[in-house]
Amino acid sequence: MKSIGITAIGMYVPERVVHNHEFESRMGIEDGWIESRSGIRERRFSAPGEFASHIGAKAVQDMLARDPDALKDVDLVIYATCTPDAMFPSTAALVAGQVGLTGVGAYDLSTACSGFVYALSMARGMILGGSAKNVLVLGGEVLSKALDQDDRDTAILFGDGCGCAVVGEVPAGYGFQDFVLGADSAGGPALYISNLADQFPDGQIMRGVPTMNGREVFKFAVRVLGDSGTQALQKSGLSNADVDWLIPHQANIRIIEAATQRFGIPMEKTVINLDRYGNTSAGTVPLALYEAVNDGRIQGGQQLLMVVFGGGLSWAACTMKWWGGRPSLHAQVAQPAEVPA
């Protein structure tokens, strides 16, 4: 069986930086309260007229700046987002047009914060099944445009940004090993954005605005991050000691700390960037992956574990041996290591 993995990566975050003090002063919150409870110091908000397709295209352009051939033979685009430009056409199709991909398949995937890992799994399956050769996968959001800016439970947590990856064939010994995907709709009312159907609690619906029960989400997240990650490792014949880098969904530092304790993986092996970007939903994992590769922490031959959770309630985990053999897959100073035979 062919080895399928990531062959190129890119990212983009909007220029506007929104610091905690903007919320704390406006909401009458004590200085330092947001960071102490979430680990978030700042986040990025998109400009007026800047939507998911635009930040997606800019992430792809960043990738192309480092690897001009990254989109060669890409024949499918999947965009994981819960803040699309429109119900249709798909935001994936809009991105394809903006980056010069014509005649390719394109669709959006909505699994909230779990979306990017879900999309990686789908891309791998479609390549192995012969339906695609190379797949451009994006995970990104412009949640600032959907937030109730007076809601303490959500407004302070979310930010905007997009990461992208090309999925294709990689040398033997590298790439994706196993995936775990799951969802439980019984927990749906704990985290949702209502749209067409009035099926969530009466009196609490604000159409198009994220609504969250933080206490329930915390308990769920700690459990499923630990369980799904352990399942993925077991499917791959690995243990937590084999993991070089854990890349978790960047929702809340307390969730991450509790999950790493459940894993037995130290925080020193955990990629964290929520302090600067907040929760970008489907964008958190590709943004964290990109930064850790770009600064030289993640290098070729290292074992990665990605774990995510989101609305649905949903969850996903992925084990992967990082390749690092193309320009955007390693830092300028880092050289990819060989995988032992």
UniProtKB/Swiss-Prot annotation:
The keyword Lipid biosynthesis applies. It is found in: Cytoplasm. Pathway: Lipid metabolism; fatty acid biosynthesis. GO terms for molecular function: 3-oxoacyl-[acyl-carrier-protein] synthase activity; beta-ketoacyl-acyl-carrier-protein synthase III activity. It catalyses: malonyl-[ACP] + acetyl-CoA + H(+) = 3-oxobutanoyl-[ACP] + CO2 + CoA. Its EC number is 2.3.1.180. It comes from the Bacteria. Residues 250-254 are annotated as: ACP-binding. InterPro entries: ACP_syn_III_C, ACP_syn_III_N, FabH, Thiolase-like. It is an enzyme of class 2 (transferase). GO terms for biological process: fatty acid biosynthetic process; secondary metabolite biosynthetic process. Catalyzes the condensation reaction of fatty acid synthesis by the addition to an acyl acceptor of two carbons from malonyl-ACP. Catalyzes the first condensation reaction which initiates fatty acid synthesis and may therefore play a role in governing the total rate of fatty acid production. Possesses both acetoacetyl-ACP synthase and acetyl transacylase activities. Its substrate specificity determines the biosynthesis of branched-chain and/or straight-chain of fatty acids. PANTHER family: 3-OXOACYL-[ACYL-CARRIER-PROTEIN] SYNTHASE 3 (PTHR34069), BETA-KETOACYL-[ACYL-CARRIER-PROTEIN] SYNTHASE III (PTHR34069:SF2). This is Beta-ketoacyl-[acyl-carrier-protein] synthase III 1. It comes from Deinococcus radiodurans (strain ATCC 13939 / DSM 20539 / JCM 16871 / CCUG 27074 / LMG 4051 / NBRC 15346 / NCIMB 9279 / VKM B-1422 / R1). The gene is fabH1.
